[in-house]
Every structure is written in C-alpha cells, then in structure tokens.
Regions:
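Alpha-helical transmembrane segments and their cytosolic membrane-interface
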Residues: 73-140, 230-239, 250
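Core alpha-helical transmembrane segments of integral membrane proteins
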Residues: 113-186, 190
Length: 255
C-alpha cells in the first residue's frame, strides 16, 4: 500500500475517533470505531489509547507510525456520535472510500443537527416543565423558560472563549440565580427553588457522568475517573454559583 494512502487511512480513523470523544462518546465505543475502520483496510496490529483529553494511535509494526491528538474541549452530542457510527459502518463495509469518509466526517463536525434557536427553545420548555414537576406553577414555568435559555446561552458563550468548562457553569449558574431572584421579587414565579433548579438543568453534566460510569464498567479506569471527576467538579461549580448568589442576597437583607 502507498505510504500516503496509509497515512490518509490512519488520519481518517483518528478523525472519526476525535469527533466521537469531543461529542461525549464512551471510550470503548471510540476505540472500537477506530479499530474496525483500520481493520477493514488490513491494519490489524493496532494499539490505541483513548481518554477524554488525548488520543494515541500507533501501528505495532517496527516501522509503524504513531499519531497523537489532543482534545481541548468536549460536549454532549449524541446525534453526532450516531452520524459518525453511520460513516464508520459504511466505510468498513466498503460503501465509501477514504476520501469520502473524511469529507463526511468534516460535514458532521461542522454542522448542527438543529438550529440554535430550536435547541434553546427545546431546552427552555424541558427545564420549565421540570420546574412544574417539582412543585412550580405557570408563573414558575415562564420564569424558568427564560432563565434556562439564558443559562444555556451564557454557557455557550463563555465556553467558546475559555478552555475550562467550570467557568461557564459557575458564571451561568450565578447569573441565572440572580435573574430568578429578581423574577421572584417582581412576582414572576411563586417557587424560587423550583425556578433555580429548573434554570441550572442545562448545565448539569448528566451525560458526562453516565459516560464515566460506563467507562468504569467496561474497564477504562482512567477515562472513567477523569469523566466522573469532571462531572463532579462541574456540579460543584454550579452549586457554588447558586450558593454565592443566595449568600449575597441574604447578606443584603434576605429573600
């Protein structure tokens, strides 16, 4: 096989794995994808190391190459993971070439499955419905609808400008708590607790924590530990943001 073609195959498989890890995929799923794609082209002596922050791919042959990819940011996008799986299956079955697979992967990484406004609206309605579920009324529904969309939007803006997910969650939870209290003061919302809990739901790392537990179950202890600790730290950042807001308002005369 031509050396350039070999490099192209490895980079395509690595790219598929990168998109999956960035989108919150479990480690074992990303490793399985990269191994299947390479095995379909005759590369059977492959070693991989996948974690939430780095991917290492190497050929065990004496003159084999080694590839390393850093993952600076991650999110949760199950639709993107499914789309990569579809490309991987087509590639393994020989339905598409390496170049076609790479082009499809680039499209998957750059496109959004839904318009941003629709994602915000869906998030807001879901969080507002949860506020009703835990004891709120229609005024809490309206307040939570607004504050949860604000939380999602703030988190997206801050995470785009920062390399840490903790800052966005802290500032987001702090600001939406302030807005929720102000809404409560003007009569928009009768249950402040329901409004705040519903408002911070977009920030809660439920998928990340679940992925970490699944990594533990499949024996990927490093990835499982990293994901779970990250999820716990995000939860602490959210709680700290809400706590700071409540403490300050209480110090200023109470709620």
């Amino acid at each position: 096989m031509d050396v350039n073609e070999e490099v192209k195959i490895f980079r395509t498989a690595l790219y598929a794995c990168e998109i999956m890890v960035k989108s919150g995929s479990e480690t074992y799923r990303a490793e399985d994808t990269i191994k299947r794609m390479l095995a379909s082209k005759g590369f059977l002596n492959i070693s991989t190391f996948v974690s939430p922050t780095v991917i290492i791919l190497g050929d065990n042959l004496k003159d084999g190459n080694c590839y390393i990819k850093n993952i600076p940011k991650r999110s949760s996008n199950l639709a993107r993971i499914e789309n990569v799986n579809e490309v991987s299956r087509s590639y393994v079955q020989g339905k598409i070439s390496t170049d076609e697979a790479m082009e499809k992967l680039k499209i998957i990484e750059n496109e959004s499955p839904y318009p941003y406004w629709l994602m915000c609206l869906g998030c807001g309605i879901s969080c507002a419905a949860f506020a009703i579920l835990i004891g709120g009324n229609y005024t809490d529904f309206i307040a939570t609808l607004i504050t949860s969309i604000l939380a999602l939007h703030l988190n997206e803006i801050i995470n785009a400008a920062s390399n840490t997910v903790f800052l966005g969650n802290f500032i987001g939870s702090l600001i939406v708590s302030v807005v929720a209290i102000l809404f409560s003061k003007i009569g928009l919302g009768s249950s402040l607790e329901s409004t705040i809990v519903g408002s911070v739901l977009p920030l809660v790392p439920g998928v990340a924590f679940t992925g970490g537990v699944r990594d533990f179950i499949t024996g990927d202890l490093i990835s499982g530990t990293a994901r779970c600790i990250e999820a716990i730290m995000i939860g602490i950042a959210i709680a700290f943001g809400v706590g700071v807001c409540m403490t300050v308002f209480n110090a200023l005369g109470g709620l």
